[in-house]
Amino acid sequence: MYYAIDVSKWQGAVNWASVKAAGIRHAMLRAGYGNSAVDPQFKRNAAQCTALGVDWGCYWYSYAASPAQARQEARCCLQVIQGLKPTMPVAYDIEYEPCILALDNATRTAMVQAFLGEIEAAGYYGILYASKDFIQNKLNWRELTAYDVWCAQYGSACTCPLPYGIWQYSSSNPLGIPGYGTSLDCNRVYKDYPQIIQDAGLNGWIASRPDKPADTEDNSAPDASTKYQLVTIGPVSTGDAMTLMRLCEQLHLTNQGLYRSAWADKPAGTQTLTIGPVSSGDAWRIMRQCLALELTDHGLYRSQYVE
């Protein structure tokens, strides 16, 4: 677990050197809001975080009133972050705006799916930001189990009904970042997002190859050799193997002979899976399932580009 702050124009010109000196090396930055508004501090925040080695992601505050409008917000967000290569997720921030509260749960849920679907289709790691109350009472949350969650719930515990990777636990600066008194959002983060994102080749990064460290950036021009990945998973339980096989069936990989399993030497009764070569999009879908199964947390998901 590590800590992160989230900021927008309301924090003014953040002194990122001071933030880093206080021990904070991860941040979520507001990229913008609504149909096309860019946060006036975003470019500066992203540039300074990158220069100082502070891992950052971003969020887009929604004013959408339909799935189509949420999809357009996602496209605007993608335009704003194009070429910046964040190492933390890209979040859909849905809150209690009147235009959103006027909708029913089904429409709000479809908006989440539309925004995050657009983000993921572009090769970015998407995450839902909402309060625990909003998730539980304003969304059909059981339909959102495929997505990672950044949950806001202030207090000593998070009781979000969905598994979450980030918990916004306070808005009163309990981390004591200089210059913000008792007004700064603070978060506990439970996944190694920079490693996950760079290993999977998301957010504009090139997936790590066996002859390079996982965090090495490949600036070579893309070609046919960088379009497909070989995925190795395991050792995993038979139940997890069956879950992944069903996903591969849905992706039409099994009927092409691209899903292979073998019994592992140990632990007894476990399997090692080899999947591919598959497109980067399919590799991302497989990795997302592995995230849900908590396999990535134990280093059981590995991928590499193949010729």
How would you name each of these model-derived features?
Residues 1-116, 120-125:
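Substrate-binding cleft of extracellular glycoside hydrolase catalytic domains
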Residues 108, 122-128, 145-153:
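Extracellular glycoside hydrolase catalytic/binding regions
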Residues 56, 125-127, 149, 255-256, ...:
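Hydrophobic anchor at the start of a short beta-strand
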Residues 1-11, 17-18, 142-222:
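Functionally critical loop-and-helix segments that line ligand-binding/catalytic clefts
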Residues 69-72, 134-144:
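Glycine-rich, charge-decorated loop segments at or immediately adjacent to ligand/cofactor-binding or catalytic sites
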Residues 59-63, 218-307:
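Solvent-exposed beta-strand motifs enriched in subsets of small alpha/beta binding domains
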Residues 119-137:
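Aromatic-lined carbohydrate-recognition surfaces of secreted/lumenal glycan-active proteins
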Residues 78-92, 96-98, 139-163:
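Structural recognition of alpha->loop->beta junctions
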